């Protein structure tokens, strides 16, 4: 059964978008899905379950369903005007519209464990789960903290990531994408990009302003070759550009709690060289790390310049430190660096 696709005339009548933005042009969506080549991962899309968070006007939802005909497609949308719009447009369709809040953690335990409305298949972590996909639109202001929480869930293998390596297609402001995808040494490098690099393989798939590409690593842009579209193809048209990223969890082999402590404290002072910043990990830290780090060039680096492997190396040394502090007694705000420029 084909699902009707809302048009620009339909969505332009809506008054409230709650600060979020949505691509409306089906032609661009088709280019995006061709680029993603999702059937490589989901060889049997008829067995796929899709959880759509903040679907808004549902254009992407309808196009996705018509293209892949998944076994189950559930939309979590609590915002009043958008929920009413979805119900009116998709009444009687195979799309499952649920008035639930994607921001509320209890939504998922209720949906999956208690009511069993949406129950994904648990798969081993040696591959991307080929029967469960998550898509989300967090293009509103202040979404960065939520993305950080989701990234942390990948590291802790909880929330939706207890079902294995679950791919996520994520719309966000282009400024957030730039910070998320920043490489070592870039001005926008932050704890957000450090976490992303440690736990995921994330690619820029599409963006609504070519000028925004200047803020990304040029080699990465050449590799990703993102689809470009115009502000006229998103609604509402005013405001910041938006971007789509593809996020795949990856393997990692380090102690997450100790790694989080080390990266969090160092990134707060991200432009201070290691040869003077290590006391931030605990009293006596500078003397200890100076004696243990054999590569003296590493000591000249600032946290903003460190690679994922270098953070893991420092975490290993931290765990071997006889006088390391009790990380469970740490009360530093994990998002402090995300608002520190």
Swiss-Prot record:
One of its GO terms (biological process) is mitochondrial transcription. Its EC number is 2.1.1.-. Keywords: DNA-binding, Methyltransferase, Mitochondrion, RNA-binding, S-adenosyl-L-methionine, Transcription, Transcription regulation, Transferase. Mitochondrial transcription factor that confers selective promoter recognition on the core subunit of the yeast mitochondrial RNA polymerase. Interacts with DNA in a non-specific manner. Present with 9380 molecules/cell in log phase SD medium. Belongs to the class I-like SAM-binding methyltransferase superfamily. rRNA adenine N(6)-methyltransferase family. This is Mitochondrial transcription factor 1.
């Amino acid at each position: 059964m084909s699902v009707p696709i809302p048009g620009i005339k339909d969505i332009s009548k809506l008054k409230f978008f709650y600060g979020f933005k949505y691509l409306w042009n089906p032609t661009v969506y088709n280019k995006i899905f061709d680029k993603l080549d999702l059937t490589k991962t989901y060889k049997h899309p008829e067995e796929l379950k899709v959880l759509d968070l903040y679907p808004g006007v549902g254009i992407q939802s309808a196009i996705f369903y018509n293209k892949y005909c998944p076994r189950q497609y559930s939309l979590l949308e609590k915002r009043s005007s958008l929920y009413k719009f979805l119900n009116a447009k998709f009444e009687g369709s195979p799309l499952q519209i649920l008035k639930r809040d994607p921001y509320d953690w209890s939504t998922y335990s209720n949906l999956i464990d208690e009511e069993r409305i949406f129950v994904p298949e648990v798969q081993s972590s040696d591959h991307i789960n080929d029967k469960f996909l998550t898509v989300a639109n967090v293009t509103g202001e202040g979404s960065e903290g939520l993305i950080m929480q989701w990234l942390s869930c990948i590291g802790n293998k909880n929330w939706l990531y207890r079902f294995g390596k679950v791919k996520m297609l994520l719309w966000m402001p282009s400024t957030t994408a730039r910070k998320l995808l920043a490489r070592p040494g870039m001005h926008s490098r932050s704890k957000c990009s450090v976490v992303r690099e440690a736990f995921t393989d994330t690619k820029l798939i599409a963006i609504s302003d070519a000028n925004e590409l200047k803020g990304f690593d040029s080699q990465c842009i050449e590799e990703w070759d993102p689809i470009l579209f115009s502000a006229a193809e998103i609604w509402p048209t005013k405001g910041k550009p938006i971007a789509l990223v593809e996020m795949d969890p990856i393997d990692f082999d380090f102690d997450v709690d100790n790694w989080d402590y080390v990266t969090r404290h160092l990134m707060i002072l991200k432009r201070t060289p290691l040869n003077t910043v290590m006391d931030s990990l605990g009293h006596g830290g500078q003397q200890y790390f100076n004696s243990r780090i054999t590569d003296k060039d590493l000591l000249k680096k600032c946290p903003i310049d460190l690679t994922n492997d270098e953070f893991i190396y420092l975490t290993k040394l931290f765990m071997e430190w006889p006088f390391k502090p009790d990380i469970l007694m740490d009360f530093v705000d994990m998002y402090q660096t995300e608002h520190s420029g």
